[in-house]
Amino acid sequence: MKRLVKCLCMILALSFCLAIPVAAEETTPYGSSYFGSRDAYLWRTSSTSCEAWFEITAVRGMAELGAQFIEIEESADGVNWSVVATYNRANYSNLIKTNTSDHTSYVTYSKMKPNYQYRMYVRLYAKDSSGNIATSSMYGYFAN
């Protein structure tokens, strides 16, 4: 009887060990092993306009590198945000650079209102020579 209990305990212990879920995925910075560093920020140029800047560095040369799009958002209360402008790569060729490992660019927004807060949302983009694509998104705020 003692031997049976030991055997059952061993089987039960083994089944618990094998039933524990284990996460085994690799985590890379910025959601992609393509991106080395990245930054996004707004730069006020007047009381009614600002520049939305992004800087991106890839870990190696890319066929295409930059931003798929940039959105400018505004808020009267700092809680509820609305998109007031969208700049995409199809209409703004400066957002993507080819055959490079780094890219810095900006777009200008010129309809800022007094007493409103502004931020930018950017979707960064990298495409290697094999056609593999990686994206990473981030918000940017006023640097000045």
Task: For each feature predicted by the language model, list its residue ranges.
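Sec-dependent N-terminal signal peptides of Gram-positive bacterial secreted proteins and lipoproteins
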Residues: K2-A24
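Low-complexity, Ser/Thr/Pro-rich intrinsically disordered linker/stalk segments at domain junctions
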Residues: I20-N144
